[in-house]
Amino acid sequence: MITTVLATNKTEFHNYIEQLKVKGKRIFSPDEVEYLANNDGFEAVELKQEDETDEEFLALFSTWLHERPQQSGHTDYYILFYLRTSEQLTSEQFEYMERNVAECFETNHGWLYELNDRLRFRLRIRMICSYKKTFRRLVRKDWRNGMDINKQ
């Protein structure tokens, strides 16, 4: 398994999530991009399958997730799972991901996208995380410019 960091600063992260597309359509709306990029921290990583079987690759991904330092606070995470053409995760693979991946993020929110629109020979996973040290349940916004009133 090959691991690559896709963004190292806030500008790169913003540009990276803004340009993510499937069949020419953006994955994240402009509001989602702003929300994710303006949090306290971020992470964008790609993992590529080498000579492992699909099950071994999922197990390595799970192990990698468990070994990395856990973030405190609230995390929104997205897993973009690049599959082979017309392939989908089996119910066993999805249950494995649900059991072993979701536990690394405690009670935080996660989304899994299965992308199978291109010819691929090896699996790839792109994981995007956006961290907030404090989580506010209600945010006051200025209707004129959409800015957070509490930060002004």
Q: Predicted regions span which residues?
A:
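Tubulin/FtsZ superfamily GTPase core signature
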Residues: M1-Q152
